[in-house]
Amino acid sequence: MNNQCKTIAHVLRVNNGQELHVWETPPKENVPFKNNTILIASGFARRMDHFAGLAEYLSENGFHVFRYDSLHHVGLSSGSIDEFTMTTGKNSLCTVYHWLQTKGTQNIGLIAASLSARVAYEVISDLELSFLITAVGVVNLRDTLEKALGFDYLSLPIDELPNDLDFEGHKLGSEVFVRDCFEHHWDTLDSTLDKVANTSVPLIAFTANNDDWVKQEEVYDMLAHIRTGHCKLYSLLGSSHDLGENLVVLRNFYQSVTKAAIAMDGGSLEIDVDFIEPDFEQLTIATVNERRLKAEIESRTPEMA
């Protein structure tokens, strides 16, 4: 087995010299190439290397895959997470999407998890996507934040907010994040419904039956508001909001999303399709190689140390 790292690193210069890091995983040789290129938007507090396994599954099945780390987030891109806002997440996604277009990439399918799914719903009618796949996607940001943080901080006046919000062990700058939520209408379920109602982009949403942060009935509600009806919901049985909580859950996530991508690449919402599964050694090699690549990039960038 070839142990060489296949991941290709790119750096986009944005916002007066800030760096937005993008990784590319070409499709495997000797498999039929798919019609669409896949762009993966990682969930909150997840780096793009956390999705090495999913990229490997998709690549094994003929997809060209790109991932990125948002600005002001965990990972390789510029900025610190205490300045992260939902609008920053949106701008990062759109920057990578438009960069792919300038490279001549015409058919782009987006896969977005957790908080990044809310960003995807925001832009679904603005970007010319072939399809959208979301996993444990946030539809009611205020409710999810209350579940995750243990308190509805968005109910407080700005001057009564704590300095930071501890979200999955990371310190969000409370004032900048909350102001952005209200100023750009990220916070409510209704704001999500308004954004998706008129989309013509085919959508598959995966919920997790043990997810305490996202209500499945609200995801149903969102899909019911899509006027074309070109959407479908599937459940990841046995999973919580943490798709990497154990290897069984993680494998089910990889398999399900890969099958959804194959189906949607062929114009279908039915994910009962054949697919190629990479072996465990292959996944391990890809993961180790990407950790080395990440460490090498960080060692060349003093501010990341």
Curated annotation (Swiss-Prot):
Gene3D superfamilies: alpha/beta hydrolase. One of its GO terms (molecular function) is acyltransferase activity, transferring groups other than amino-acyl groups. It holds the Pfam family Acyl_transf_2. Keywords: Acyltransferase, Luminescence, Transferase. GO terms for biological process: bioluminescence; fatty acid metabolic process. The active site is at 114 (charge relay system), 211 (charge relay system), 241 (charge relay system). It comes from the Bacteria. The keyword Electron transport does not apply. Pathway: Lipid metabolism; fatty acid reduction for biolumincescence. Its EC number is 2.3.1.-. Acyl transferase is part of the fatty acid reductase system required for aldehyde biosynthesis; it produces fatty acids for the luminescent reaction. Belongs to the LuxD family. This is Acyl transferase. The lineage of its organism: Bacteria, Pseudomonadati, Pseudomonadota, Gammaproteobacteria, Vibrionales. The gene is luxD.
